[in-house]
Amino acid sequence: MGAIGLLWLLPLLLSTAAVGSGMGTGQRAGSPAAGPPLQPREPLSYSRLQRKSLAVDFVVPSLFRVYARDLLLPPSSSELKAGRPEARGSLALDCAPLLRLLGPAPGVSWTAGSPAPAEARTLSRVLKGGSVRKLRRAKQLVLELGEEAILEGCVGPPGEAAVGLLQFNLSELFSWWIRQGEGRLRIRLMPEKKASEVGREGRLSAAIRASQPRLLFQIFGTGHSSLESPTNMPSPSPDYFTWNLTWIMKDSFPFLSHRSRYGLECSFDFPCELEYSPPLHDLRNQSWSWRRIPSEEASQMDLLDGPGAERSKEMPRGSFLLLNTSADSKHTILSPWMRSSSEHCTLAVSVHRHLQPSGRYIAQLLPHNEAAREILLMPTPGKHGWTVLQGRIGRPDNPFRVALEYISSGNRSLSAVDFFALKNCSEGTSPGSKMALQSSFTCWNGTVLQLGQACDFHQDCAQGEDESQMCRKLPVGFYCNFEDGFCGWTQGTLSPHTPQWQVRTLKDARFQDHQDHALLLSTTDVPASESATVTSATFPAPIKSSPCELRMSWLIRGVLRGNVSLVLVENKTGKEQGRMVWHVAAYEGLSLWQWMVLPLLDVSDRFWLQMVAWWGQGSRAIVAFDNISISLDCYLTISGEDKILQNTAPKSRNLFERNPNKELKPGENSPRQTPIFDPTVHWLFTTCGASGPHGPTQAQCNNAYQNSNLSVEVGSEGPLKGIQIWKVPATDTYSISGYGAAGGKGGKNTMMRSHGVSVLGIFNLEKDDMLYILVGQQGEDACPSTNQLIQKVCIGENNVIEEEIRVNRSVHEWAGGGGGGGGATYVFKMKDGVPVPLIIAAGGGGRAYGAKTDTFHPERLENNSSVLGLNGNSGAAGGGGGWNDNTSLLWAGKSLQEGATGGHSCPQAMKKWGWETRGGFGGGGGGCSSGGGGGGYIGGNAASNNDPEMDGEDGVSFISPLGILYTPALKVMEGHGEVNIKHYLNCSHCEVDECHMDPESHKVICFCDHGTVLAEDGVSCIVSPTPEPHLPLSLILSVVTSALVAALVLAFSGIMIVYRRKHQELQAMQMELQSPEYKLSKLRTSTIMTDYNPNYCFAGKTSSISDLKEVPRKNITLIRGLGHGAFGEVYEGQVSGMPNDPSPLQVAVKTLPEVCSEQDELDFLMEALIISKFNHQNIVRCIGVSLQSLPRFILLELMAGGDLKSFLRETRPRPSQPSSLAMLDLLHVARDIACGCQYLEENHFIHRDIAARNCLLTCPGPGRVAKIGDFGMARDIYRASYYRKGGCAMLPVKWMPPEAFMEGIFTSKTDTWSFGVLLWEIFSLGYMPYPSKSNQEVLEFVTSGGRMDPPKNCPGPVYRIMTQCWQHQPEDRPNFAIILERIEYCTQDPDVINTALPIEYGPLVEEEEKVPVRPKDPEGVPPLLVSQQAKREEERSPAAPPPLPTTSSGKAAKKPTAAEISVRVPRGPAVEGGHVNMAFSQSNPPSELHKVHGSRNKPTSLWNPTYGSWFTEKPTKKNNPIAKKEPHDRGNLGLEGSCTVPPNVATGRLPGASLLLEPSSLTANMKEVPLFRLRHFPCGNVNYGYQQQGLPLEAATAPGAGHYEDTILKSKNSMNQPGP
């Protein structure tokens, strides 16, 4: 059967009391091969204490017994019966050093220090090691080793026995101890007591140490035993596997000698740990190398001036090294690796000096990883013969070796060395040896693995023995693949709606060999932020200094909008200590399993693991963990060093990169050198995201510092609440920079705040010192505020505070508006429980409500701790908190001993309107109308009388006398405070005591004063040499000037050539673009790209061209033209390939010409953006756009029914032609338009042109749906309460409310008014509103309170909707939700829907649309103006109010007052009323007067039957005296806009001529017109055109009319001019 083995190799450096100094130069014995001793110098016997010092003690801790039994022995009795494990042990020593002590056998030669043969060691006889009875009685086992035991154990031929092992059988002892024993296992190995042989015990003790004794512990199953040969494993049966784990005790440093790390003494009486070059030989014929010979042999040699004749009397006899050579060569003696902890470490070498020296001695120090340096040897003065050479070694940082070189000069050079020692290399007691266990696992085929590779879910042995059933028998949680459940992992607090960790199969992972169960968490379909925690079983504390590791596989699939952390929690006394060992955040996984190894360092107590996952909305990820294991190294391996020198970063790798056949390589886990400390590292402490009067919490600081090198503990109660506690990492000089927080801003002066103070000091700190750091927080600002009343004060709309100040000269009732004081930043230590301040950086005072901008408070600094740290004086506002004062005022900042919380606002401010301006954490005082005081060592004072112009004072800063002030206190911080700690760079070696460190090379570079440079030595500064000019200045200037002129000439010539070529290309391109063939081809085949990308805001969200649905040009087919739109031609077309739509789809295509202005392009794209954002059944749908090619297209839904106005006119009932319409049809049309308007209103859009001409029908027959179709004048009012129209514009006057054409204000209520006019159009069947009235008359009529009569046969409820829409005050008009509700009531009223439509007896539609023929030269005929003669006739006539139109609903018309007289233009009699058909007798003239000459291709006719007569400015070449005066008159008006009156103004009467009216002409012609009505006109920016039909008017220029200027209107327009 196979065997399960545990092999312990425990070197003698365990808890040994070995004494190497007991065999010095005064303790020698003759060599057994050199004859009888001459002068015995050793004692006859050793005392008990001396014998104890010769022993080697092994102490195996009891914790190892517990862990080995729990982890490696089967727990159940059934398993014991099936194959009871056998625990065996032995103590092994190398035979070679022991046989050297006995002397070489005849015919056998051996060399001290020579390596063992390469072949395997010979099997040796195992000696009996002792019994359990002795161990239980004496609590330890003592083994004595003598010559008989050496000869019995090291058996075999002499050549093979020298490389064998001497072993003591300890199987019975170890088997009992591992199963039933208690306490530690103590084994003492010591020399056998031989009193008859003087000095034999000392030499035997040294030989035992040189033989490297170790303990071999094994645990085997039933089967072959390998105790006799730990290196030769039994041949296992193929049906079984074999476990064999080797544990080795070694010294803490791999290359240090096992004898003494801190001292060495060698007298060459027996083999030492020295190395020789050439190697040491004992044969006489080897004259070229070192030889070890007794002194008696040297005295018999015939050596001139040799050691035997000239040896000093005081020197004892014995063996020494001899070198006798005639060649010029170098011979070396090399010490083992050593350490030194004392500055007095010295090398002492006893050599023989001849009268005529033929060589010299040189000693060198060889530190590890450093260059060698020579040791100066000082001989004993004035002495030849035997003398001592001494050299100082000191205290090197790294381990070192010492080399003694003898350089011969030929001619029979002779060297003799009697003594080699390193003395005084340790201070105090030398540290004892440390337990070091190195483990390995041997597969049955001999493959050696590290113990950490066993039970790690990766098969490293060929037959898989390392992942066999034994791994599954480990305690719960040690080896978990979740195939049998949660393996001891438990959920946190469970909630019915919280996602939970589950154990199930992840089938779609991208690792085909990993399809088993795993621990999963799904973050998908969670509406809000959630978190989930799962906790492992509790694990025992690892052995100290063990290379403990956690191994696991993890996977994230999908997008994780959160983080996952692995936290290690120790069961410390009191509070649980948790630290994060792994973290991943905002991860986009690829469903790929990752393998990760995490080192678990400095774990000294029982611990458990927690997986904490947090995610937010939108996270769609699955987090999985599997194959979690704790390495056996945690409990069965000890490195021998206090700290594990390894990289603490997780070793994570892809599972595909894992090599399953990787074997252990020599030196793979050798300790790394301690990294050099980076002096550029600094620690930055912040508020951890906290603000206000209270400090941060532990969770906030953990989150803030999770990706930094900071780890703090935050106080949670008492005066230390919110204070960060930090441990100093190393003893050094540190630079501590403290920054206080700024004060809050006042209500009026929001531009400046009081800055926090910075203090920088230099302090000496010790390692593990605890620094208490309170980071000050900014005082709260008075503005802005979420309180609407306070916000009005902030923006200046409410002046109640100023009014109270003006009346009472103080503020009491309306107190508030001052900023809170900033908190101070404290850095202090604790001494006997009392805080000791190091640095205090004061906070800035809060600014007052009406603070002045020129106030200045100088910085104040205190360094005398005897000065009391008092709070600042408090008034209405709170004073700042100090160091150790008390206060009972809630609005005052608290001192540090009271918790340093910020003060609240004054009670007056909180009581009146809840104006909260609290002080910042760190003792900031609360604000009132005056500012709060800043915190500090002494708090800042606040104003005593609530002066609204008095700021709070800054606090007083402090620096401890223990430190050095590096820079003066300065006010620099504009926000929260900070603390920055870094290593202080010592620049004392520099000439100016200032330096910096190069961030790349980490070298210190000194600064120099201005005008000097750093010398080559890197320390001193020298004056920079002034370079002498080599060429005259005149020559340099002439060359530069000539080159510059030549360059300018060449550049100018090149520019002209390029310009001429570009000009010619542009002309050719313009000619090509103007050709009709090019335009037609571009409509179908153009592929010119555009990069224009405007932004538009819809309902608070930014939109751009990228949001539009782009339709490829190849999918668009143009069929026929439909007309001319606002930008270009409109075509009927078809679109194919549109998803969710029939193919082909009939569309209307609006085009933008290629040659257009930038404003036209912007307006076109803006309309596309607006229409594309609407999604309503009563708004024309935007199918898509085609903007990537020229000309650009907008694809709209094709409305076959045409516009609503034409439809109503065509379907009027006539005597000869009854209509298919009913009153219910008209109500349905009105309801559809109201639904669309409600949608626009809810999305904060104003259409500004709701009229029948802009509404389209899906079909003319039944089932028609009305939709709003033109958005050329729509505007987004999401961010403003109204839209003010400015500039030059043409507006539909008859559809506009008074505030729109009087003041240019457009709101959603504007569309309500327009909808009332639309209702009138619908129920009048397409008549022009305000029949027989011109635009000017409509202005007068509406502003005087007049409203239209109901259309013929209009139901009363419908007319009431119209009148409610025509309310004078916008807030009195209903919204469209109410309008829809009332229209629905009308559709259910039988009296309404049964009302018959009126029969039309007027002219046909074709006749209504006709317009009188215009003259061929319209420019020669001026538009009509109000004549001066008419004005004079009105002045002579008695003043009488003009007749008002009939008011709505049959109400009697009010008699207008003098202030309400409308401006009327004298005209002929006209029929008034709501149903006169004269308005529709107009037609479009084919005159050139109305063509548009702008950049847009507008309709060629300016006549619009809906808008009336539009007017455009066009200069004329005819001379006219009135025209010469007109520009001057308009220039004096001070009006905005670019619209001007045509200068060709003449008197005349022309039917249908346009009448131009300006505010100036109104005021000049009608003196009784009230100015308050006219000053709200758009100041000439909007030209209102209207037509008069058959009215005899005489136009004349009114004197002084052009000089009218409304100063109020001018100032208003100059101050408030919103954009269109």
Curated annotation (Swiss-Prot):
It is a single-pass type I membrane protein. Residues 654-666, 1410-1419 have a biased composition (Basic and acidic residues). Phosphorylated at tyrosine residues by autocatalysis, which activates kinase activity. In cells not stimulated by a ligand, receptor protein tyrosine phosphatase beta and zeta complex (PTPRB/PTPRZ1) dephosphorylates ALK at the sites in ALK that are undergoing autophosphorylation through autoactivation. Phosphorylation at Tyr-1507 is critical for SHC1 association. SMART domains: LDLa (SM00192), TyrKc (SM00219). GO terms for molecular function: ATP binding; heparin binding; identical protein binding; protein tyrosine kinase activity; receptor signaling protein tyrosine kinase activator activity; transmembrane receptor protein tyrosine kinase activity. It catalyses: L-tyrosyl-[protein] + ATP = O-phospho-L-tyrosyl-[protein] + ADP + H(+). InterPro entries: ALK/LTK-like_GRD, ConA-like_dom_sf, Kinase-like_dom_sf, LDL_receptor-like_sf, LDrepeatLR_classA_rpt, MAM_dom, Prot_kinase_dom, Protein_kinase_ATP_BS. Changing L560F: In a breast pleomorphic lobular carcinoma sample; somatic mutation. It holds the Pfam family ALK_LTK_GRD. The modification Phosphotyrosine is found at Y1078, Y1092, Y1096, Y1131, Y1278, Y1507, Y1604. Residues 1060-1620 are cytoplasmic. The chain crosses the membrane at residues 1039-1059. Changing R1275Q: In NBLST3; constitutively activated; retained in the endoplasmic reticulum and Golgi compartments. Expressed in brain and CNS. Also expressed in the small intestine and testis, but not in normal lymphoid cells. This is ALK tyrosine kinase receptor. The gene is ALK.
